[in-house]
Amino acid sequence: MKASELRSKDAAELGKELESLLKAQFGLRMQKATQQLANTSQLRNVRRDIARVRTLLTQKAGK
C-alpha cells in the first residue's frame, strides 16, 4: 500500500484500515507459528503498512 493512497483518506478511514491490518497481521502470525505461511515477506509488508497508517494518524492528529 502506498503512502499517497493513505494520505487521501481521513482519520476514520485510516482507523478502519489499521484495524483490518492488525487482524491480517494476527492471522499471518498464526500461520507462521503453525508453519502454514509460505511467503514470510507478507508479514513484513503488513507490519510496515501498519507503521505507515499509524504515522499518518499521528500526523493528522497534530494538525
Swiss-Prot record:
Pfam family, one: Ribosomal_L29
Organism: Bordetella avium (strain 197N)
UniProt lineage: Bacteria, Pseudomonadati, Pseudomonadota, Betaproteobacteria, Burkholderiales
Keywords annotated in UniProt: Ribonucleoprotein, Ribosomal protein
Annotated family: Belongs to the universal ribosomal protein uL29 family.
GO molecular function: structural constituent of ribosome
GO biological process, one term: translation
GO cellular component, one term: cytosolic large ribosomal subunit
Protein name: Large ribosomal subunit protein uL29
SUPFAM superfamilies referenced in this protein's UniProt entry, alphabetically: Ribosomal protein L29 (L29p)
Top-level taxon of the source organism: Bacteria
